[in-house]
Each structure stands twice: as C-alpha cells, then as structure tokens.
Amino acid sequence: AGALVLIWRVHKLPVTRNASVKVVLLTAACMLPVYIGINWVNRSATMPLPVVQNNALQTVDFAVFTDKPIVLNVWATWCPPCRREMPVLEQAQQNYPNLHFIFLNQGESAAEVNDFLNSQGLKLENVLLDTSGAVSEAFGVAVLPTTLFYSPQGKLLYRHVGGVSTASLDYALQQLTQSTPEE
C-alpha cells in the first residue's frame, strides 16, 4: 500500500523538474516488495551443511557449528565493504563467545586469505574457503558481503546484504541471542 501511495505522489510531480526524482522513487517503490519477498522466503530456509576447507587447508563440516547460533559472513579480500566490516565482525566474535562466527571467503586461495588477514592484523576464527562459489550458491548468496544469522537448528533468522556497521550488527546479534535461549 505504501508503494502505491508513493507511486501516486510521484506521478503528480512535474516531469521536467523532477524526472530523476521520479526514477529513483519508482525504482525504490518497485524494489521494496522484491526485497521483502526475498526476506520472507528466506526465513523458511534451513542452513545447508557442506564440507569445506579452512584457511589452514583442514576439512571442516558445517555440522560442527550446530550447537550454537551462527553468524555466517560471506566475503572476499577484493571487496571494499567486506574489508571495512572485518574489524567490526572480529570485535563481535570476541564479544559474543556464545555464537559461532563463520567467515566464508569467496573464490580465493588460503594463501591470499591468510596474507590479507595477517596484513590487517585480524584474528578471526572459523575462516572457511569457498573456492568454487558452490557453497555460497547453496546459501543463496549472490552479493558480497552478505551476513546470515541462523538458529542452532539451522533456521535462517535474518539476512543482511552489504557491509555491517557496529550498530546494525549489534541489533542483529541482540535479535539472534533473544530468539535462541541459552541451554
């Protein structure tokens, strides 16, 4: 209903003066239902349990992470928003030991990932590699960075597309910890 009101109001604007405003507002009005639909569908999704390698080239089964709520960050070293959010995620990993933080790198080698982490002074646990992109596809990730929040039962509770800030991550983590009571 809100999108229809917005379209009606934009339609009344003079074309010559506000053409670019109309385009932006109409695009936003059209994309909002798509965004809501994607999040609605994803709420029923369950977490895939792939087997991958970590940045030490050891095999890791995602099933080992099902004892706590999960924050899965999908990222790459070449992605500027990914690089900016890493210190925020590192701090959250230290502040929330009752959660599993998983950092799933896209398409890069262990050497590239480790060089990046060392150059930035990042001490991240659970750095996993998705060299082919198949794992991120199984999680429904098409944009970097994307952060997924799962219950211990593997139910997707929230999806954040784009870089996280301290405030947006804290809010999502509070929602995650409140929706999954401690055992």
Language-model regions: role of each:
Residues V71-L72, F101, T147:
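Hydrophobic beta-strand anchors of alpha/beta hydrolase catalytic cores
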Residues T66-K68, N98, L122-L124, V141:
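Active-site acidic short loop of glycosyltransferases
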Residues K68-I70, W75-W78, V143:
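Short pre-active-site segment immediately N-terminal to redox-active cysteine/selenocysteine motifs
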Residues N55, T77, Q106-S109, D130-S132, ...:
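Solvent-exposed coil/turn segments that connect beta secondary-structure elements
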Residues R83-Q120, T131-E137:
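Structural microenvironment flanking redox-active thiols in thiol-disulfide oxidoreductases
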Residues L49-I70:
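A short beta-strand-turn-helix
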Residues A1-V51:
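N-terminal targeting signals for export/organelle localization
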Residues F116-K123, D130-P181:
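Thiol/disulfide oxidoreductase modules built on the thioredoxin-like
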